[in-house]
């Protein structure tokens, strides 16, 4: 088991604050869109209830989330993606490179569970791989 030095207990759960921040952005900017790959229901339930027309859930399809966000950005929307860090980068990496970076698409990506040690996996499911892929 990975030693966390009590980090999770010290940090607490930032999801409610993130939910409020996303609601504020949606309220202030009609072009704001939130896209998730099947995790926002747990992390941002109030946003989804309050702004259902500004929320897209691609299911367990990070590449689709990246492609959707890039397309929305190119059309003038302000998309943010919320998903597990490792899957955003490793499963969505080609979409980030080809459809966001090459196109100059203004997309923001929020990675959650960065330090969470997946018990069924090893290093490929922690933040180290995400950082390596994007660097």
PLM regions and their residue ranges:
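Thiamine diphosphate
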Residues: 1-135
